[in-house]
Amino acid sequence: MRQFKTESKKLLDLMINSIYTNKEIFLRELISNASDAVDKLNFKSLQDPSVKLDQGDLAIRVSFDKDARTITISDNGIGMTAEELERNLGTIAHSGSEEFKTENAEQQGSDVDIIGQFGVGFYSAFMVASHVKVVSRAYGEDTAHVWESDGLEGYTIEDGERAEHGTDVILTLRENEKLDADGEAETYDRFLTEWGLKSLIQQYSNYVRYPIQMMVSKSRQKPKPEDAGDDYKPEYEDYQELETINSMTPIWKKRISDVEQKDYNEFYKSTFHDFDDPARTISFHAEGTLEYDALLFVPGRAPFDLYSKDYEKGLALYSSNVLIMEKCDDLLPDYYNFVRGVVDSADVSLNISRETLQQNRQLKAIAKRVEKKITADLEDMRDNDREAYEKFFENFGRGLKYGIYSSYGMKADELADLLLFWSAKEQKMITLAEYAKGMPGDQKAIYYAAGDSRERLAKMPVVKGVLDRGYDVLLLTQDVDEFTFQAMREYVAADMPKIYEDDAAREAAEKAVADGAEPEVEDRHLELKNVATGDLDLATEDEKKEAEDATKENEDLFSAMKEALGDKVEKVAVSARLTDAPACITTEGPLSLEMEKVLQKGPEGAPDGMPKSQRVLELNAKHPVFDKLVAAQKAGDTDKIKQYSGLLYDQALLVEGILPEDPVAFAAAVCELM
């Protein structure tokens, strides 16, 4: 019995029980080792003309014996001598593959891709096996050698027999464990089934470059006997057939010109379990200091659980065609969590078990490039296939808005131009850039209204007032919309016609254009303004003068109305935004009525101490109702002022989609007027 060199049983226990968290990856590791062995022989044949090799014969074979409780992984690769068995398997964490890569670094070409690097993958076999036997015959040698160990104390190496070069790794599986206190137990029998092994091969090693073969059970109809009568019923028989389980060449490593869209669609649907074709397919290859392939998909519709806390984002991460992580969330920002796909790179730094990644600059560089590619593709869809983009935005636009809101506006530069909102003027979805291009020359802000439906917003007096002045209003109907705009604060519109400070500068520019010069453009910072909040600064000088005069003349009326309404409003004032309606509710400060409603819709309602919107009751001084208020004030009719104040406030709330605090009293007041 030979002892494991330099490392103790404690270290082996660490390898088996601590490094790996998922026992089923033992098959991935052993198949990767077999692939490396075949790669080494393939490389040797390229360097040494005397090595005669038929590429079509190179393969890996997996088999099992349920009665003997064994799984065998065989390859016809380069094999190992007794010395190599001693060095590679007798010394824990010694990687023959890493040594091979180092020794042949300058000679290796694109035809060899060694997977192993740490020298511990082989020992994952002891997670499921009570005994491991390795039979190996090195290429060019006449004698095979057998390495055996139970993973406890040491190992033996003896002479053996094998018909040709290559290696057999034979695992004797552990017995099933007994139920623990939680009623759980590891059942190793699951690895002793055809379906169990096939599914593991296809999950983790589907794109290993060599055929992974298994004898599989099939059924076929027996030949019909020549003397069979009319009442003959077909008979069937079971048989075994050698079948290649893996796909070998991954679709993301094929040249784009060699793959049809239908092939991408089928790969997407089968891999990511979707019934619909993807809306977009993004395939690219990166070279340089960091080399990788990426194949990304934008789904045609949102997964049912996309916005639930249980949804997991991430791309499948492969290293040298071997699956490392099914969902690597570090490769996608949260606002692109809907993207599905694959990244394959041999350059990312893995941890020793290859189950997870080490935090490294390579991964961040890949993620940054992936993000840019997704953004560019979405921009292309927005500009060249608007119908498809609007459908995409209907499915996934909420996430883009959350990307801006959750980053406190830091991601606005990347995402703002991907957003779409309904234009009250154009009656269609438009981008912020399109809104800016359609503005009158004197417009200095982007106007919006927030609520639960476009139909209701379009009828709001404050919206109509802005539209009547010739300015468009964006109608925001998702709960995150206004929070997103508040996080952005402004939108920088690029290549806008330059605004000149004085007539002389403007006239000089106009003359230059007339003489053939290009019109001057500038980036314009446009504030995002809620039409129901604050001063929109849209009134003309004459309108401002009229409002000031009306305010001064009716200070006593406004004071009486404020007293009647109490702390429901901050103040009562003359409106500069109304044209037809008698009154409206606006707000001062950062919290609008709509934002207050959204916060109150939370699972526990409005939290204690949550600030409320600072409401203002604005009156249209040109409306007949205002004249009645003035008359009541002059007559000293405080009861009527109180009644009218309550009615105007409650009807303004109804227009905003908010029920009066006392609907019964409101109905009674309306009936009394009738």
Go through each PLM region and give its residues.
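GHKL/Bergerat-fold ATPase module in large chromosome/replication-associated machines
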Residues: 114, 132-154, 174-179, 183-674
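GHKL (Bergerat-fold) ATPase N-terminal catalytic module, capturing the glycine-rich phosphate-binding loop
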Residues: 1-187, 191, 199, 222
